[in-house]
Curated annotation (Swiss-Prot):
Belongs to the influenza viruses nucleoprotein family. GO terms for molecular function: RNA binding; structural molecule activity. GO terms for cellular component: helical viral capsid; host cell; host cell nucleus; ribonucleoprotein complex; viral nucleocapsid. It is found in: Virion; Host nucleus. The keyword RNA-binding applies. Keywords: Capsid protein, Helical capsid protein, Host nucleus, Host-virus interaction, Ribonucleoprotein, RNA-binding, Viral nucleoprotein, Viral penetration into host nucleus, Virion, Virus entry into host cell. Late in virus-infected cells, may be cleaved from a 56-kDa protein to a 53-kDa protein by a cellular caspase. This cleavage might be a marker for the onset of apoptosis in infected cells or have a specific function in virus host interaction. This is Nucleoprotein. GO terms for biological process: symbiont entry into host cell; viral penetration into host nucleus. It comes from Influenza A virus (strain A/Swine/Wisconsin/1/1967 H1N1).
Length: 498
């Protein structure tokens, strides 16, 4: 994909910066990470958490959610205008887990949002530091991507559950900005657009008046973001059609679903970033690491190095497997929910099993679960190698694929054949081939059919030893191509419920 002059790297999106050189980007990302770390340390002090309790990922998530809630201006405004019984719009909170007499106990805490905003700003040199907030949102989104399937959401919008590899970032809040848009998969944006079009079909005033004008601007902006993710002219031309439609309706929904399917073979560019839990950054800051001075990158070796020497714990339910819980969090940390399991496994240096074989539920614990029966164990988040995260979809190579997920979205820039069976994907393309976009559809289908394995394997750099910080000696791993590469294969993951 030709990089236009206007493209900002994701680190710039992430830090809201203008064009900067590599050193400045590393410094501003470092400043953002350091701010999250300082905030976390301060919150642990305020909550009087012990060192061990501060390393508990469930406590980290509660603290992260509190700061996101404190800065959610739209929702805060809504809560103040529509007061509900027993909910103080000025307060936020959640479960904090403490170790008391050898048992874990849950304590529900409540905090003034104003107080949390003060702590956050103080940790971020007095600024609002929205980049840090977005970073936390992306970590939560990556955790959801690894934990839940979105079958129901896909079916509701008329898409096929086998397209789950396109759904990265589907739980990101609207307010996640450019950095959020960069990590959203093709399917996620298609789903947002379909929801909009459906509202327009059901509500005559949706596109009308002053509000309608704003809605229209949002619609076109979203179409442009999606267009920017496609790498072929025909897909982009089809997006222009969808964007310019006077009155978007079922024809546009059809076109969008067609485009989403085409992305299983002609993949879109989706950014991947390693976003870690706040407690990891807190631990590093507490041990004297100066992120701003050292610089930091979300797509290089830095997150791997950080995880090599961070000890994070998690509560484990009685019948869960701690190794499986570790795999889940490792995948979330590296945004690898839709990556080929063989690639992830090679980098991690441990076998990575599909979601359906994991004996673990999500990381967060529901309020009705009995915490006293739970133990805590160390999450194994280290890796054998590291690899650069990719922002291109790469291309694809014909391979047997599964009944569950039928394509992958590469996370790591590692050379490999991409697994999926052309027949499975092409079967999705029978049906509607007339209308305004017929010539583009024909062109897209032709490209998909003529895709040859060799043009289509993913050309990446390879993996690197952890001692090879400058990425000088790429190791190109060889994979057993007969194994199953899809994470959501034959799956029984829980559905994501808000």
């Amino acid at each position: 994909m030709a990089s236009q002059g206007t493209k900002r790297s994701y680190e710039q999106m992430e830090t809201g910066g203008e064009r900067q050189d590599a050193t400045e980007i590393r410094a501003s990302v470092g400043r953002m990470i350091g701010g999250i770390g300082r905030f976390y340390i301060q919150m642990c002090t305020e909550l009087k958490l012990s060192d061990y309790e501060g390393r508990l990922i469930q406590n980290s998530i509660t603290i992260e959610r509190m700061v996101l809630s404190a800065f959610d201006e739209r929702r805060n405004k809504y809560l103040e205008e529509h007061p509900s019984v027993g909910k103080d719009p000025k307060k936020t909170g959640g479960p904090i887990y403490r170790r008391i007499d050898g048992k874990w106990m849950r304590e529900l805490i409540l905090y003034d949002k104003e107080e949390i905003r003060r702590v956050w700003r103080q940790a971020n040199n007095g600024e609002d530091a929205t980049a840090g907030l977005t970073h936390i949102m992306i970590w939560h989104s990556n955790l959801n991507d690894a934990t839940y399937q979105r079958t129901r959401a896909l079916v509701r919008t008329g898409m096929d559950p086998r397209m789950c590899s396109l759904m990265q970032g589907s739980t990101l809040p609207r307010r996640s900005g450019a950095a959020g848009a960069a990590v959203k998969g093709v399917g996620t944006i298609v789903m947002e657009l379909i929801r909009m079009i459906k509202r327009g079909i059901n509500d005559r005033n949706f596109w009308r008046g002053e509000n309608g004008r704003r809605t229209r601007i949002a619609y076109e902006r979203m179409c442009n973001i999606l267009k920017g993710k496609f790498q072929t002219a025909a897909q982009r031309a089809m997006m222009d059609q969808v964007r310019e439609s006077r009155n978007p309706g079922n024809a546009e929904i059809e076109d969008l679903i067609f485009l989403a399917r085409s992305a299983l073979i002609l993949r879109g560019s989706v950014a991947h970033k390693s976003c870690l839990p706040a407690c990891v950054y807190g631990l590093a800051v507490a041990s004297g690491h100066d992120f701003e001075r050292e610089g930091y990158s979300l797509v290089g070796i830095d997150p791997f190095k950080l995880l090599q020497n961070s000890q994070v714990f998690s509560l484990i339910r009685p019948n869960e497997n701690p190794a499986h819980k570790s795999q889940l969090v490792w995948m979330a940390c590296h945004s690898a929910a839709f990556e080929d399991l063989r690639v992830s496994g090679f980098i991690r240096g441990k076998k990575v099993v599909p979601r359906g074989k994991l004996s673990t539920r999500g990381v967060q614990i529901a309020s009705n679960e009995n915490v006293e029966a739970m133990d805590s164990s160390t999450l194994e988040l280290r890796s054998r190698y590291w690899a650069i995260r990719t922002r291109s979809g790469g291309n694809t190579n014909q391979q047997k694929a599964s009944a569950g997920q039928i394509s992958v979205q590469p996370t790591f820039s590692v050379q490999r054949n991409l697994p999926f069976e052309r027949a499975t994907v092409m079967a999705a393309f029978v049906g509607n081939n007339e209308g305004r976009t017929s010539d583009m559809r024909t062109e897209i289908i032709r490209m998909m059919e003529s895709a040859k394995p060799e043009d289509l394997s993913f050309q990446g750099r390879g993996v690197f030893e952890l001692s090879d910080e400058k990425a000088t000696n790429p190791i190109v791993p060889s994979f057993d191509m007969n194994n199953e590469g899809s994470y959501f294969f034959g799956d029984n993951a829980e559905e994501y419920d808000n």
